[in-house]
């Protein structure tokens, strides 16, 4: 989708995938519009998937408190401090609408879980 996040509406999307790596999440968590969009997406109950360092953006959006998830090892302390229950020994953790994974070596399991979760979330858009 080619749209600025400032112009994006949660209503226009079925699901959200937050990228991993260090640069993408670091840039997203510093962008006020991106953080607002992620916060609104989580509040909507729609499916969200995140891998590796991606949950940093969820932390910034105050969207991990009381959630079970996993991530790259170096950000697990950030997740715990934000109120998350971190699961370190699973390739993929599904907590309701949220799918998370640890990193690149878990991509096959993550992709399968995301496809399953996003397929369940597909509903016709109004209009």
Whereabouts are the PLM-identified features?
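Active-site-adjacent pocket-lining segments in enzyme domains
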Residues: 1-127
């Amino acid at each position: 989708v080619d749209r600025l996040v400032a112009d994006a509406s949660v209503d226009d999307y079925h699901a959200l995938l937050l990228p991993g790596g260090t640069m993408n999440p670091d840039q997203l968590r510093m962008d006020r519009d991106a953080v607002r969009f992620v916060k609104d997406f989580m509040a909507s109950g729609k499916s969200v998937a995140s891998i590796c360092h991606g949950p940093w953006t969820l932390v910034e959006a105050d969207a991990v408190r009381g959630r079970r998830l996993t991530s790259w090892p170096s950000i697990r302390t950030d997740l715990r401090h934000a109120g998350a229950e971190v699961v370190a020994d699973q390739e993929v953790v599904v907590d309701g609408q949220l799918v998370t994974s640890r990193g690149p070596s878990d991509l096959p399991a993550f992709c399968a879980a995301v496809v399953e979760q996003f397929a369940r979330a597909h509903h016709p858009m109004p209009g």
